[in-house]
Amino acid sequence: MNKRGNNNKMIFKTPQHLGLLCSTFIFSFFFSTAIWAVPNASPASTDNLKVYLEQIIGPDDYRNYKNIQQLQRVSAWIKEQMHLFGIPCEYQNYAVNGLSYRNVVCRLTNGHADKVIVGAHYDVFGEQQGADDNASGVAGVIETARILVQQKSQLAQNIEFVFYTLQEAPFFKTEQMGSFIHAKSIQSQKDQIQGVYILEMIGYFDENLVQEYPAGLKWVYPQHGNFIAAVSNLQSYALGSQYCQSMRALDRLECQRFIAPAFVSGMEFSDHLNYWKFGIPAMMITDTGSFRNKHYHSKTDTLKTLNLAKMANVVDGLVYSLLTPIQP
């Protein structure tokens, strides 16, 4: 049990770029206080990201596979927040060991045949807040959606936002992962899927630490931990290339590309792996996770360790990339 306390009072916040609707919204018996963001066309906002992170992390129990009530709380909040942006969502329900789990699938459509998928997992490993892993990724997807809904007419494809359950152990690399369930469900549409962008830990940066890498890569890439990484296989080369080009165009945060097959350790450490299995191009946007973040899978993975300004840079790069036609 998290002992941070539970404040049931109505809370009001007013970020610079975005008005916030704050309400007491009851989801069954488990969700008593919620904060909502109202859509407004603007660059990624650190204030919004903080609100999302606080709501995802929550005040009480941890959102691991044993605490289904917490997983339901988070998925219900995500669905309602996206609804307030004008993006309809549905649950993708499935059972594991007789228990019910669900992805949240949200669609921003504008009449195109092709689509791009943007996703992140919302569960955690064990008993910890999981601020970087992976509340940061979920917050990034939500903020991306907020911006894109205001620029819908500029999109050259539909966008499907997916929030996955059961990415963490003991389900990682099994067919019970939420991303495996989703990837399998869309395999017949793969010719219409331009690519999948997975946000996996996007909030930890430290220019003073010595960055670690999978074997053989430390001589090629920077020693500092102050960049965002675009991880892809050869099939997904164009996705990673375009994302880093977008980051370079914005010129706010360094972007490094990693291109390798799934058998190279570290390249497969998230939900993009399941799309590769079905021949769907996919990439991971990440701060490199356990290769950088000393708080990985520990109780010290908290909100105060995140760099919200650089998270916002990561989101702006993704928005820029999604508004630019993918170059093969």
Language-model segments: which ranges?
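Bacterial N-terminal signal peptides that target proteins for export
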Residues: N8-S23
